[in-house]
Amino acid sequence: MSEKLRTILDLLSCPDDGRPLRLDREQLVCSGCGRGFPLHEDFAEILPRHAARLPASASADYRGAYRSLFERPYQKDDTCLAWGAEEGATPSWIRKRQRQVAAMRPLVTEGIEAAASVLCDIAAGAGHYTFAYAPQFRFVLHCDLSVENLNYARRKARERHLENIFFLRIDYFQPPFRRSLDRILCLDTLIRGEAHDAMLLKSIADSLQTSGTAVIDFHNWWHNPFRRLGLLPENFHSNKSYRRSETEILLAETAFGSATVFPFVQEFNPGSRLDRICSRMVPSTRIVYRVRGGPRAPAESAPFSRQHRR
């Protein structure tokens, strides 16, 4: 692992001071503050010294869960399940996830050089996307804060003989990247409210190279407005769904160079005849954007382009 890690070392930096990391025996060491970050077989823990200060609007439940995940020491466990693991999901849920993996693939892989490109999933969870896209990239950075998610994903990657994935335990509010990444993925994560999601978007923007791209998504409020209005039982609980105008405001306040929207309807197989006919009449399940890095002041407005307006 240590020698293999050298190939991506120039992508990593200290989450505290942003200085480069160097490999020193069985740990990574910051060239500035001198902090050491442990290596465990096939993954590295690169957490900041302190947890992030969450916005006042964050729920007590989320605050507690975040703090618990951040403070939990690593312990290897070959039996745990990640959130969203197929072993604990319904067939219907799995089909929807597989459709999204298929729909996102061209957005993630367009223009890559398979022998050189690196994909970073900044909140990778059970690995649905990283495992599917790994064969098309030289390396994949599978990042998460949860010990359970990382243990599960490492186990599944070994079972599938995927050897080009690096597992990194990070805090996505303070990631160990400084304008070093060419391709970032962040799906099913921008759901905790505007303040939380703005913090995460800034982290993504600060991690992207000027020429890099990120694929992100928001849950669409209009996909099921009756639930959002309380006329049907709510199945999204305290999480946040967005209207298109709200997502554009969030992105305009973040230092991205441009943003292109790709609405996605998860009820139909991507590219199928039913998808081509019905997806224009059904509000999109997710509002997906491909955003580009760029040296732009946060107060400026990102230029938007659209595939469809829904």
Predicted regions and their residues:
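Short, glycine-/aromatic-enriched active-site segment of Class I SAM-dependent methyltransferases
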Residues: D217-S238
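Short alpha-helix
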Residues: N239-A255
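N-terminal auxiliary segments of SAM/dcSAM-dependent transferases
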Residues: S2-S68
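A short, conserved alpha-helix within the catalytic core of class I
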Residues: R192-S203
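A conserved beta-strand element that flanks and buttresses the S-adenosyl-L-methionine
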Residues: L185-C186
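Class I SAM-dependent methyltransferase SAM/SAH-binding core
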Residues: C120, A126-F173
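Conserved catalytic loop of SAM-dependent methyltransferase domains
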Residues: A259-V288, R292
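Conserved class I S-adenosyl-L-methionine
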Residues: L47-E113
